[in-house]
Amino acid sequence: MKGEKTMIITLKDGSKKEYAEAKAVIDIAYDISEGLARAACAGEVNGEVVDLRTVLDSDCELNILTAKDEKGLAVLRHTASHVMAQAVQNLYPEAKVAIGPSIDTGFYYDFDHEPFSREDLDAIEKEMKKIIKKGAKIERFTKSREDAIAYFKEKNEPYKVELIEDLPEGEEISFYSQGDWTDLCAGPHLMSVKGIKAFKLLSSSSAYWRGSEKNAMLTRIYGTAYATKDELKEHLEQMEEAKRRDHNKLGREMKIFTTVDVIGQGLPLIMPNGVIMMQELQRWIEDEETKRGYVRTKTPLMAKSDLYKISGHWDHYKDGMFVLGDEEKDKEVYALRPMTCPFQYYVYKAEQHSYRDLPIRLGETSTLFRNEDSGEMHGLTRVRQFTISEGHLIVRPDQMVKEFKDCIALAQYCLQVLGVEEDVTYHLSKWDPANKEKYIGEPEVWEETEGHIRQMLEELNIPFTEDVGEAAFYGPKVDINAKNVYGKEDTMITIQWDALLAEQFDMYYIDENGDKQRPYIIHRTSMGCYERTLAWLIEKYAGMFPTWLCPEQVRVIPISEKYNDYAQKVEAQMREAGIRCSVDGRSEKMGYKIREARLERVPYMLIVGAKEEEEGKVSVRSRYLGDEGMKELGEFIDFIKEEIKNKTIRKIEVQEEKK
């Protein structure tokens, strides 16, 4: 190639390939290895995922993606969603197609069609296999915006027309075809449908078009796909376990919460068992915050729109709020609060503060309201009314880093006590410079504050990812996220750096020279939303909570009804010691009562009969070790009180009962 202009392709391992002419990604993959090319799903060029058919004509970094890569697997699944849509329209020509992306655990496609039964899904799977067996190549082509609209109008696909009409004038629209079926899509996709080796359609449900209850209700089919049948089998087994742990099912079975249509979506009823758990969590969090220097506030559930106009929520978050009144007709318009911060600012402003008074740490167990779309509602994880341990720290600039780190330490302590510290990921949520109207403040302030948070996380040796566009409108934040049993990630705890709202609310302190200075603010949750935390714990422990959180901690089981009196005396002493206890005095067989207690996830059973009554003892059975032998009643009370006080998480050694 001497004397010729060459294109240099830098591969993932740092090696380089030189070409004298433009080259498709798939051809470069074959140059590397035929095995790699056969396994390839897509390419990653300078960080952007592209089709294998993409032609490269300039120097770049290239990574060949296979289904072993998360991004490569997403491409495979996206193609599987197209094959599913083709199969649906082959079998049900009247079905209109909407959207069909890949997701963390597979893929889905939305159809304007009546709900699909399990038998329908099985038939669609068979049709997909026929399509895959034919092995059609996948081709990409483009049309002008006008031609694309005309194309889908002719095919009577209104959802595709709407999507295209939302795109700018003059936009070039990309399509993908496989055989005689074509879809609107940005891609990328596999080279051929033959690349789909193992897939399964999982379920069908309802979903609003574009996630808004104002739009048409569609039918969504969920599926998943993997590179091999063994991987698919493993995933399906995990899904079965996920269904068993799903808080939406288990939480209802355990009488922790329920929902009622006439009350409304996203408005769960917390049952007595759930209230016990929430109260335990609240007492613990509030006591811990008090130890760490917080003082508590109690502020209104609503405020005039004027408050939210000062804070910026009216301009940046109004669509997520429940507004009471009409600005055009009413003298005063109110809104239920979506967060507590502006209220606590006025608690701070009620007095003048010296630099010596800071930091001031304000905590509140708040009830908040957010107008989530109906399509987003799910059990306890996404609701319209929720409870949260919220806090705002008003600090001097020189105190900001230490206090922010202390907030991270409090969050980590909470995670450790709950036994979930290994289950979370940390995210630096940043602003999006390309979407400045979403935020307040100057770019240099955002860059500086994001830099401070990045440095802190690095100093604390916390692995984290950076997420552009996920910041609050007034500042960057650390989000601590966890996945539910189905792999969907939710934010559990948030800690936000705010260098802007103190000025909005004219907050100040008096420095050592007698001058007014602006404080900084930290917005934080110590444990996050109680409802979402309950969902998380239900799924984490499959309802087998640490004893201190169990709605019922001990069940006394007399071996026959004639020992009910002694059982009730044992229960009374338990309750006197602050232990949640009941007696099963029914005339059922012992084995039945023990099994039922285990199914109801009671951690300790105390069996009492003649010997126990005579000696003032109890025979202890636990879900941890099974038979733990006979113990003095006082000894057992001391033991379980210590376990509850220390919030011990005991390892379960015995096999769980199954319903």
Could you say what each language-model-derived stretch is?
Residues 2-96, 103-659:
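NTP/phosphate- and nucleic-acid-binding module
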